[in-house]
Structures are given as C-alpha cells and as structure tokens.
Amino acid sequence: MKKERRQKSFHRGVRAEKWAAWWLRFKWFHIAEIRFKTKCGEIDLIARRGNLVLIVEVKARSTLAEAMAAVSRMNERRIEAAADIWLARQKDRALLDVRFDLIAILPWRLPQHIPAFFTSDK
C-alpha cells in the first residue's frame, strides 16, 4: 500500500513537471534540464530565455496556498545548492540572471507561475 502511494505520487509529480515544462515552452523558454539531480538536491526544471535562467520548483496540489506551503526553507537551500552546481558548469555563468520560481499545478486550471518565489541568500 505504501509503495503504491509513493509510486502514484511520483508519477503525479512527473506529469506535473511535464505540464510545467510545456507551460514554460509556451512562454518561449528553452528547457535546459528536467529533474536535475545532484548529491545536494534536485531541481525540477531549469529553463532559459536569453541570459535569464529559471530554477523552477513544481508542486501539484489542490490549491495555490498548499503548493506554496509545500516548499520549506530546507527545500530552498537544497535547490540553491543544486543550482550552484548547475551554474558552475555553465560557460556563460557570469552573464546569467538567475531566478527561483514556483509553478503550481492545480486541478482543472492552467499552471500558476510565481516568478521569484524565493531569493538566494548568496
């Protein structure tokens, strides 16, 4: 039962990430990475448009408030650490503007994109 619930949650997350990636493509962003994993943490989506880089956390929840509350300070730190690793691999990193966004996937609604959902302490 627990394994089934975990698998269902995983697949719901994958579908949400695909929907969020589609939404960003619709806004003319290039999807640079999906599910970028490091030993420090994972980034759901990394998108680029010119020098703007979006580090995106995707949450599938019933309400926008639930999606926003699902991102803890610890999650933010892990995302920042993973973003540092990704950025270190970019040749043009000195030119990049980085933003940490949230995309909430809600039932029967278009994705809710929250730009600059949190800022880096660095």
UniProtKB/Swiss-Prot annotation:
Family: Belongs to the UPF0102 family.
GO molecular function: nucleic acid binding
Organism: Bartonella quintana (strain Toulouse) (Rochalimaea quintana)
Gene3D superfamilies, sorted: 3.40.1350.10
Record's protein name: UPF0102 protein BQ09720
